[in-house]
A protein has these predicted regions:
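Cys/His-rich metal-coordination motifs, chiefly Zn-binding "fingers/knuckles"
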Residues: 259-298
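N-terminal signal peptide c-region/cleavage motif recognized by signal peptidases
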Residues: 3-5
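Extended hydrophobic/Leu-rich segments
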Residues: 7-8, 17, 250, 272
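N-terminal Sec/ER secretory leader and immediately downstream segment
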Residues: 9-107
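Mature extracytoplasmic/lumenal regions of exported proteins
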Residues: 63-256
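Structural motif
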Residues: 23-24, 173, 279
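Sec-dependent signal peptide cleavage junction
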Residues: 7-8, 13, 254-262, 268
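Sec-exported extracytoplasmic/periplasmic mature domains
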Residues: 37-40, 231-234, 238, 242, ...
């Protein structure tokens, strides 16, 4: 019998966190500056097998800037053969997503041998499709808390976000699966303004991007940032050296100390926060706020 479970990490829906997200004292991921809110907490267990997923979001002025999704799977104990088969299907045989090249993916890099998999996927995401009409209809339920937050608080959702997915599992290291999803709103990270807002028509789609040089340049930069994030991810989960991905072809030296360059324009966020404070204090009118906000974002 598969059961829902509340895990001991004590993260709660609505909880605000800063600086880092942690599963354990050892497994912890740095967060960009700002106050992140936990909006998703789910999981299941069966005997010794436990999986937990935590989703957090960064919002400014009622608009989504970024969200992150962390997964830990403790896959030890019994049923090792069945679990190995299930992991292979999860990574490589899922009909809708996985660690294999798809037409909408910009980049897939992986290491795979035996039961070990190290994977990075970079893509653009049609947010409305993902929230309300995903290719895999089962995922509609998974995004329920995201939709609830958006509807209850009138949150503005970007049409397109850039995304990277990072995954590692190896029984030679531990019995734990770790995945991290990064999703960023280009509007807040100096991205070019887009005209097309669906997965297939987006300027970021691999079939279209070469016709849009500004978007190609921006995506190339996002790929480098995603690669640096993945190198940091590999260190956090203690990936074996010979399992680690090679990013030399995109200009990143794996032997150098990794410093993750953030997309975030902290100055822009500060300006928007200061502007909102002036509005809340009655120093400026709503019309003045709207005009000033538009000027900052442009």
């Amino acid at each position: 019998l598969w059961c829902n479970i509340s895990f001991a990490d004590n993260y709660k829906i609505g909880q605000e966190i800063e600086n880092e997200f942690r599963f354990t004292k050892k497994i912890k991921f740095p967060l960009e500056s700002g106050t992140w809110t936990v909006i998703e907490k789910s999981g299941w267990f069966y005997g010794d097998i436990k999986v937990r997923v935590i989703g957090i979001v960064l919002i400014e002025n009622d608009e989504i800037i970024s969200f992150r999704e962390f997964q830990e799977g403790t896959l030890t104990g019994s049923f090792q053969s069945e679990l190995n088969t299930a992991l292979y299907e999860y990574f490589y045989l899922d009909k809708y997503d996985g660690c294999y090249q798809r037409t909408e993916y910009t980049l897939v890099k992986k290491y795979s041998k035996g039961t070990s998999t190290n994977c990075l996927v970079v893509e653009h995401m049609d947010v409305n499709k993902e929230l309300y009409n995903p290719d895999d209809s089962k995922r509609t339920h998974e995004r329920m808390n995201y939709r609830k937050l958006i509807n209850n608080y009138n949150i503005k959702v970007p049409d397109i976000m850039l995304a990277s997915w990072h995954a590692y599992f190896s029984r030679t290291v531990s019995g734990n699966l770790y995945t991290v999803g990064y999703y960023d709103n280009p509007k807040y990270f100096n991205g070019p303004k887009h005209k097309f807002s669906t997965e297939d028509t987006s300027e970021y789609h691999p079939s279209n991007i070469n016709k849009h040089p500004k978007f190609k340049k921006y995506m190339d930069e996002f790929i480098k940032i995603s690669a640096a994030r993945h190198m940091e991810f590999e260190k956090i989960v203690s990936a074996k050296t010979h399992h680690r991905l090679d990013f030399s072809l995109i200009g990143i030296d794996n032997k150098e100390k990794t410093k993750v360059k953030t997309l975030k324009n902290n100055d822009m966020i500060k300006q928007l926060n200061d502007l909102k404070k002036l509005l809340d204090e009655g120093v400026i009118t709503q019309d003045e706020f709207t005009k000033a906000k538009k000027k900052i974002l442009n």
